[in-house]
Amino acid sequence: LDVNELPADAQNKLPILSTLDFIENGQNVILSGNCGTGKTHIAIGLGIKACLSGYKVFFATVPLFITQLKELRSTKSLRSFQSKLEKYDLVILDEFGYISSDKEGAELLFTNLSIRTGRKSTIITTNLSFDRWGEVFTDPVMAAAMTDRITYKSYMVDMNGESYRMKETKKWLKES
């Protein structure tokens, strides 16, 4: 990933985020933009750097995370997992909003993100603007509360730009 090809907001904020001070301060990072602009790549890069710096990091896609939470609830081991989740310095949740969730999944996601608010850091990658978070959280009140909590003192990184994959595909087609 060529940093110079990232959207301008990402180019400006990446040096700040790379210090990992946001983890020390319990701040969140929201990487928001269209597909193929490097959101997951940046999130994973920050996660790897955090691991190498001695932080405990958890990564999951939101759909798999919700499925895991539902399974843990059904086996009555959710509280044990929540205790472990609270100990991670950084949780990275990828693909927020790519797949909508049912009410139970939305409530579980809300509860488990709320536990961390203001204390531990979470990175979320999403292709949805905040006004569309209600599509994930089926309840508009829950969507508003989640947006309020997750964005409080957060770094918002606008990742809207041209898709790297599409750019590579066009290049490949020209060469073929």
Predicted segments, located by residue:
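Conserved hydrophobic/aromatic pocket- or pore-lining residues that grip, position, or stack substrates
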Residues: 1, 43, 61
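N-terminal pre-Walker A segment at the start of P-loop NTPase domains
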Residues: 1-20
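Non-DNA-binding regulatory cores of transcription-related proteins
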Residues: 20-21, 119
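Walker A/P-loop nucleotide-binding motif
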Residues: 25-42
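Residue-level preference for the first positions of well-ordered beta-strands
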Residues: 28-30, 90, 121
